[in-house]
Amino acid sequence: MEVENSRKRQLDSRPQQHLVNGGSPSKRPRLSNGYESTNGADAATDPMELDNHGDNNHAYPSPLEGEQAPTPTPRTDGPEQGTQVDKVQELATETTFLRLMPDDTTSTASNPQDGAAATTTAATGAASPSPANGENAPILLRCEWNPKDPSILAAAGTDALARIWTISRSSTMTPAPDSESDGHVHGVHRPYHSLMDDETPKSATVGQLAWNWGGTAIAIAAEYGDKASIHIWAKDGSHVDKFDVSDPPVIKLRWSPSDAALLAIAPDNSNGNGNGGALVTVYHSLTSATLSYFLPNHDLLNWPLDAAWTSETEFLLTGGDVMLSLRCTDTAILPNRKFESRDDDTFTQVAYDWRSKLAATSSDKGILDLWDENGQRRSITAHSGAITALQWQPLPADSSPPEDERLIATGGDDCAILIWNAKFPDQKPKSYFTMESPIVAVSFTPDGAFIAGATAGHILIWKVGEHTMPRASWSRAPHPGWLSPKANSEPEEEDEHCLCWDADGQRLAYGANSRLAVINFSR
């Protein structure tokens, strides 16, 4: 009982930003999707059956226009080619589930003298979907593919979960000898590098991780009791550096554009009353020098801060009614500019686009704001509820996009995903998609050609510019393939969801609670 209470305290102490950026709001009305089926969701019997709904003509309306999302229609490619009906690719059979439980019987300890992480190889025997110690399965909080190497995936969470796997595309299609597998879903044990040193207790929570832009190193933030630390590891699992943090938890990690500095946001309780404010620290990875900026009297619990680098020395800081530009000198972090905010602003996320020099902020009131270099602000009422996801469309470095177009996607509690042209924010969205429940994450492929949207139990993938019908669909359902088993006391509601593409845009990682799926996608 004490162990379980400790785990609950770990989760309850996490900052509430997770509820905004990746939350799964409870008791939302389940609304129809533009991708319809004649089978009701409640009647699903196949383990990976689509979370479809009946043909009820209740597609969720556009937040701006009040129109129904179009149902799938025939697509005409030309008068001589005739009419073709697009087929949605079902990804259930292209799924691998990674085990998150520690394999104590086969793991090898780290060597503290050479700083190398432990390499753990799971047993080759059949895996039980519900082992005796399943109730202690870690809760997944973060997952992220290496931005340059499509075979490397990292994950972090409670119970000292911090590891990286090397997973080739072909290996994800090799099923484990699970007697309960139906042949459609592959549960696998994969060797991994643990990113925890011997000094970190097994009860630690790793709440943040971030690959650098070059994919050569990964930073993680671990907390245990009243202590916290940031570790930097090379992608081969060797330890590079460590920074102690005065007060846990670290709620954000952001690498600078050249990977020379790492920004971290954490509370500051040095005044002893528990509400001192927020501390922004920049660690220089090459020199181990640190710079700090204190934001007094900021309620970090209710209004978590987010940050985005705009150059190698400048970054934006936002959260609640705060919108600041800060600048790093050789000796300090100094205010660069304070943007004009309103009393009712409730900023939750910030994302900067170096191509257009525009910064985008989202709010829990559904407002998307676009800020130019001069601090001019243009606001869009994007959603009827909180914006839960925000991402600029990535483009290949050598591409030449149209001068009059720069796309950004938002997802919201209102079950809608919209793609906007930031160059013309007064216009209607370029595309909008709807799903059956609140959006918990959106993710563009690295080349910007496709976008995935996720709810708590369903993923749809669209080709950007084609919003009539999704290209692919994946649904989550109870199945032995979730090798990290559901704990008896694990809550049905989930605060954390991970969704990200590999560097090639051919595999999605999707995580929730104690489960992590790798989903193959064929373009």
Language model features with spans:
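Canonical WD40 repeat/beta-propeller blade segments in eukaryotic WD-repeat proteins
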Residues: 138-144, 202-210, 248-255, 300-308, ...
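Blade-level signature of beta-propeller repeat domains, shared across WD40, Kelch, NHL, RCC1
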Residues: 495-523
